[in-house]
Amino acid sequence: PGSPQKRAASPRKSPRKGSPKKSPMIRAAITAMRERKGSSVAKIKSYIAANYRVNMTNLQPHIRRALRSGVASGALKQVTGTGATGRFRVG
């Protein structure tokens, strides 16, 4: 019989619009709070929960990773604690 028919090209999906990047959210939280000793992780999380529409249970490991990478890159300065605990300031 005949040759196989070609399938119609499927329409391209638009890129998924998820939550904003974590590091700008953390930087915005720290600068908005303007705490003298630096901002604690709990305060940063509560600021993000209050000001962004995000699911905090899914976001917590991403916040920890963003804090560690921010300290490693020099964008954030860790005043007290180690890892993703303690208090943080902007670079």
Swiss-Prot record:
**Is DNA-binding there in the keyword field?**
yes
Output the InterPro entries linked to this UniProt entry. Answer: H1/H5, Histone_H1/H5_H15, WH-like_DNA-bd_sf, WH_DNA-bd_sf
Task: Give a GO biological-process term.
Answer: nucleosome assembly
Q: Where in the cell is it found?
A: Nucleus; Chromosome
Keywords carried by this UniProt record? Chromosome, DNA-binding, Nucleus
Biased composition of type Basic residues is found at 9-20
- Map out region (Disordered) in residue numbers: 1-25
Per its UniProt record, what SMART domains does this chain match?
Answer: H15
Where do the H15 domain residues begin and end?
18-91
GO terms (molecular function) for this protein are: double-stranded DNA binding; nucleosomal DNA binding; structural constituent of chromatin
Q: CDD domains this protein is in?
A: H15
Name the PROSITE patterns on file: H15
GO cellular component term of the entry, any: nucleosome
First-listed, main subcellular location of the protein, grouped into a coarse class: nucleus
Q: Which PANTHER family would you find in this protein's record?
A: HISTONE H1, HISTONE H1, EARLY EMBRYONIC
The role this protein plays is: Histones H1 are necessary for the condensation of nucleosome chains into higher-order structures.
The family note in this entry says:
Belongs to the histone H1/H5 family.
Protein name per UniProt: Histone H1, sperm
